[in-house]
């Protein structure tokens, strides 16, 4: 079982490492559902020796991005790769809340060029047809997708997550997130068949 802890600063990353987290997701401004952290925090977190996935999101609000904003994210992904991060964490939707395939493809390609994995974050939960959207992420080449199954918590969305894990057939990692705690993670693993889990405290 891989446990990914969501962290908003270097001190939290250090605590996660010392608490035996498998990996961290580094972001800033959780009150806005997470934005790109500072370059200084990215570099300092990577230096702690734990795999660091970095949120790449230039602003709060809707997950529909302009060409200028996509360009900013491409540059941020490149920096993360050069800094030694493990993956970028991104989510781009179109006006109908489907996957923005064109933008996501460009971002995945840039991540791969700089040795980064690619997590599509919980913007996925807004997609009305999750099975179709999962297929698109697989075709694009995303490493993983973070999801609560479209429910307020992963436990409430466990049946949807289980279906997505089944459909994924090992082609993409389906990672439950949303209310995941030490007290429910084993049950959630049993219900969904997932092997990676995301939360603010998982130990």
Kindly give the residue locations of the regions a language model identified.
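Catalytic cores of alpha/beta
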Residues: 8-19, 54, 62-79, 102, ...
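Helix C-cap/helix->beta junction micro-motif
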Residues: 48-50, 83, 113-114, 168-171
């Amino acid at each position: 079982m891989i446990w990914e802890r969501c962290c908003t600063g270097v001190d939290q990353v250090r605590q996660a490492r010392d608490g035996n987290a498998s990996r961290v997701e580094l972001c800033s401004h959780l009150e806005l559902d997470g934005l790109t952290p500072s370059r200084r925090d990215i570099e300092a977190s990577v230096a702690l020796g734990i795999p660091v996935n970095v949120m790449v999101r230039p602003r709060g609000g809707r997950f529909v991005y302009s060409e200028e904003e996509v360009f900013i994210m491409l540059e941020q992904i490149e920096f993360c790769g050069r800094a030694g991060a493990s993956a970028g964490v991104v989510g781009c939707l179109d006006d109908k809340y489907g996957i923005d395939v064109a933008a996501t493809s460009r971002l995945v390609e840039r991540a791969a060029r700089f040795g980064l994995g690619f997590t599509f974050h919980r913007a996925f939960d807004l997609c009305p047809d999750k099975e179709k959207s999962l297929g698109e992420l697989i075709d694009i080449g995303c490493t993983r997708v973070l999801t609560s199954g479209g429910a307020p918590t992963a436990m409430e969305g466990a049946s949807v997550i289980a279906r997505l894990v089944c459909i994924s057939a090992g082609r993409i990692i389906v990672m439950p997130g949303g209310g995941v705690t030490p007290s429910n993670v084993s049950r959630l693993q049993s219900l969904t068949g997932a092997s990676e889990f995301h939360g603010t405290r998982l130990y």
